[in-house]
Amino acid sequence: DQYIKIRNNSDEDLYADGMMLILSSGLNSGMNSEMIEGKDFRKECCAGNAFYCIPGNGQDVLVKAGESLIVVNNAQNHTIGNPNSWDATKADFEWYDVSSNENYLDIDNPDVPNLDKWYASTLTVQVLHNRGFNAVAIAMPPVGLTAEQFLAEYPLKDAQYIFHSPNGSDYTMPLRNCYRVPNEW
């Protein structure tokens, strides 16, 4: 029953068409890592390894001032299996993944629109970390940018960080299969 609530906290109505949800690359759970000097990209962009966009043509997904969108992993009635959960069948959108492993299939609710999947590094289904180790960000890519253009123009190459192990050793760790989202978005 994972979900993301996106609130329009402005005093004007806004359209969410094209809004990108980004799942960060790397773990954000502690102070046991640091960026390599001269290779810290964070002032220019964020790194992600999963990108989903709200579909629409510019004026299809209105979010009125003070209201919210709910995006869920599986738009199912979760109270059936857990009475303490909630009914996600009324969500605005769900993210859906076609899995390459028949043991880990996603559930698609045809009554809830799917986000447009631009990329996810997983070959199965994308889930949010149960303790928030990976950050979630939102961005508004330029109007007209396609998934194909994004993947061709925004790879994050040679990104690395230093992991400080509890055993006292430091390890240089690469960020693999990730793309950059400029902070201006």
Question: What does each model-found stretch correspond to?
Answer:
Residues 1-185:
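Activation on beta-sandwich/Ig-like modules and their edge loops
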